[in-house]
Amino acid sequence: MSGIDPKRFGKVAVLLGGDSAEREVSLNSGRLVLQGLRDAGIDAHPFDPAQRPLAALKDEGFVRAFNALHGGYGENGQIQGALDFYGIRYTGSGVLGSALGLDKFRTKLVWQQTGIPTPPFETVMRGDDYAARAQDIVAKLGVPLFVKPASEGSSVAVEKVKSADALPAALEEAAKHDKIVIVEKSIEGGGEYTACIAADLDLPLIRIVPAGEFYDYHAKYIANDTQYLIPCGLDAAKEAEFKRIARRAFDVLGCTDWGRADFMLDAAGNPYFLEVNTAPGMTDHSLPPKAARAVGIGYSELVVKVLSLTLD
């Protein structure tokens, strides 16, 4: 284990649930995080901000929080700002990194300006003429395309579009979830990877091979036929290079401590970064525990390591 006296952490809230589209995932993550912290002797308690006012954290003597909320106010900087106000230390990125990390549109703008490779894309606003925009976008980017709300996680409302005719309906559906919709050129030929970031841990890349078209919500949290390849199949030099770029992609957004950076490789082996996740899932299907397990770090040790970053 970490060798840290559990009493140093004081009373810890595991933030879970919330009211985003990812509530059920967060509840699952939070329950496991809670058990992992308790297994290490830490005084940890569940706290669902959808059911209790945040002021109760201060009133009840919590001194730090493990943020297992996903999406919405749990990941967009709002919870982080409130915790800063109450003087409660918390896991993960601060206000700026959280806000940028959840916003795929502004993430891509920052990456374009800082030399992080990311797929070509267009944006569509809720209420636009979807048929007209679809025609313009296909002319610029071709097909296949990925359509996704700018600020949802866990692949909520993400659709792979293979024909121009299917694009208007996909735009309309995604716009129900966010006023900004990202339409991204699909990067084909080299596979999907994730880089898990956790303080100074050197975690391996994971190659993700879903049984279906792409790594959607079902593949992430329900299916048992998604393959997670560790080692990922890249040579050591390439893996080290892509981990370095992933860390920079994380850092230029102001993200800190821990999270994930997801990317695709094209047929020539060039990386294209898709998004970061500043509050990654911690369910039994989730990627950070898998990466940690591959280098001999158990679940409880991982969550204690993440929480220990709040002691600095």
From Swiss-Prot:
Q: Which cofactor names does the annotation list?
A: Mg(2+); Mn(2+)
Which Pfam families does UniProt cross-reference here?
A: Dala_Dala_lig_C, Dala_Dala_lig_N
Q: What is its EC number?
A: 6.3.2.4
Q: What NCBIfam families is this protein classified in?
A: D_ala_D_alaTIGR (TIGR01205), PRK01372.1 (NF002378)
HAMAP family referenced in this protein's UniProt entry, alphabetically: Dala_Dala_lig
- A Gene Ontology term for the protein's cellular component: cytosol
Q: Which residues bind ATP?
A: 138-193
**Location(s) in or outside the cell:** Cytoplasm
Q: Which organism is it from?
A: Burkholderia pseudomallei (strain 1106a)
**Ranges where the ATP-grasp domain occurs:** 108-308
What's its job?
Answer: Cell wall formation.
Catalysed reaction, written as an equation: 2 D-alanine + ATP = D-alanyl-D-alanine + ADP + phosphate + H(+)
Where is it predominantly found?
cytoplasm
Cofactor info, note text = Binds 2 magnesium or manganese ions per subunit.
Q: Name one GO biological process term.
A: cell wall organization
Pathway per its UniProt entry is: Cell wall biogenesis; peptidoglycan biosynthesis
Binding residue positions for Mg(2+) 2: 275, 277
Q: What does the record give under GO molecular function?
A: ATP binding; D-alanine-D-alanine ligase activity; metal ion binding
| InterPro entries per record | ATP-grasp, ATP_grasp_subdomain_1, D-Ala_lig_Van_CS, D_ala_D_ala, Dala_Dala_lig_C, Dala_Dala_lig_N, PreATP-grasp_dom_sf
The protein's name in its UniProt record = D-alanine--D-alanine ligase
- The residues that the entry says bind Mg(2+) 1 are 262, 275
Instruction: Supply the alphabetized keyword list.
Output: ATP-binding, Cell shape, Cell wall biogenesis/degradation, Cytoplasm, Ligase, Magnesium, Manganese, Metal-binding, Nucleotide-binding, Peptidoglycan synthesis
Which family is annotated?
Belongs to the D-alanine--D-alanine ligase family.
